[in-house]
Amino acid sequence: MFSNQYIQQRIHKANSLREEGKNPYKNGLKRSLTNAAFLEKYAYVKDLEGPKDKEKCESIVGRVKLLRLMGKACFIKIEDESAILQAYVSQNELNDEFKSLKKHLEVGDIVLVKGFPFATKTGELSIHALEFHILSKTIVPLPEKFHGLSDIELRYRQRYLDLIVNPSVKDVFKKRSLIVSSVRKFFEMEGFLEVETPMMHPIPGGANARPFITYHNALEIERYLRIAPELYLKRLIVGGFEAVFEINRNFRNEGMDHSHNPEFTMIEFYWAYHTYEDLIELSKRLFDYLLKTLNLDSKIIYNDMEVDFNQTSVISYLDALETIGGISKEILEKEDKLLAYLLEQGIKVEPNLTHGKLLAEAFDRFVEHQLIHPTFVTEYPIEISPLARRNDSNPNIADRFELFIAGKEIANGFSELNDPLDQLERFKNQVAEKEKGDEEAQYMDEDYVWALAHGMPPTAGQGIGIDRLVMLLTGAKSIKDVILFPAMRPVKNDFNIESEE
């Protein structure tokens, strides 16, 4: 694993430190300031030739990013999470320790410097070293940079290298953290209670998706990694909670692309005595809050598209298919005509698809990618909404919406089905679809139906994909760019590939 010549050279230097009585993985030394705090505290220091106040001694830590040796002195760029700070190390102060430093120190090593502030002749605030310690000897040379597409997979597989080399990547994940904490704060301010529900389910449910299956040895039964927390959260509404939310992982055993990862983060929230129309207004307030928190304008650029949050609109499913998708009502209303139309357009359609699923195929193909500004699409076909409340005026549609931004689904919400008999029939229909070969159809969950039978108040519920939300608000083009360790196909690692030194 460590046979590479450059790695061997570094291992030799680590052993050489041990021979000098120095631990190359020293512990217990503390910094007094972050690099950013040092730069802020001593910003007034400008004069190299003026008196140096060695009493103002600080300790800083970080990774060596640049090393310039110049005889009896050297300049070192040291980076911690907050900033890069230059250190000046001279043989005059360190004596024999300076010789050891020159012999052993390399780019990538993690160090501690204790010293006083001063400014170079160019006016750069630096730390003048009085002590220097290697805290962690890096034995694998770091890459200087990544070279575009050829290294994208390496960035995802070895995210730690990506974070070391590309500061902008770290910024994305800091912004992700801010987005998640802001979403949490928003719902707390709205009066919602954060809860946690099981990650392993006896029956997969809450969404149309294929589950991951595992096995519980003690109980001797199969368990399913959750595809959605929905049915457990609605059990809490039955139990008397009136506004709950959960931010956590879901797992779906399906394909991967630039907007899908099998392990992803969602927020789901449920609100008793409210309707899906209330959720639409709540969603608008949420985005207003996020844009203000992140100091973003109401117009943002994503994938070369201008998204204007001031142009938020609401449109029904069929109207969107007609006015945006360009399909006439005559075709949309007849199952046989719609099937023929899709086939004429070269769309491969699975046999025995229901009218509602044919409409969904048409929507995915002709409408979704055109929804650039925030668009709430309402009145979904009941056949593709097995957990949503049936509309009072039209039993063929559900009181449901999905939010699309920049051509992608961001949220899904609806007034919840709380009629246990209707829910039982919907589950039976889903089971029939599964028996016909639909792997994504939902399972029968009699325990959930039994919970509904105890009475669930009128409730509205919604899910928002956090990863896609972060993509939108950071401009990331792939979901892998906003997940620290995305799912990747396993490869045999060659840890001895020659590195540029």
From Swiss-Prot:
This entry's comment on the bound cofactor is:
Binds 3 Mg(2+) ions per subunit.
What does the record give as EC number? 6.1.1.6
| Cofactor(s), names only, from the UniProt record | Mg(2+)
Query: What is an example of a Pfam family matching this protein?
Result: tRNA-synt_2
The record's Gene Ontology cellular component field reads: cytosol
PROSITE patterns, per this entry? AA_TRNA_LIGASE_II (PS50862)
The chemistry this enzyme catalyses reads: tRNA(Lys) + L-lysine + ATP = L-lysyl-tRNA(Lys) + AMP + diphosphate
Domain of life where this protein originates:
Bacteria
Q: What is this protein called?
A: Lysine--tRNA ligase
Organism expressing this protein natively: Helicobacter acinonychis (strain Sheeba)
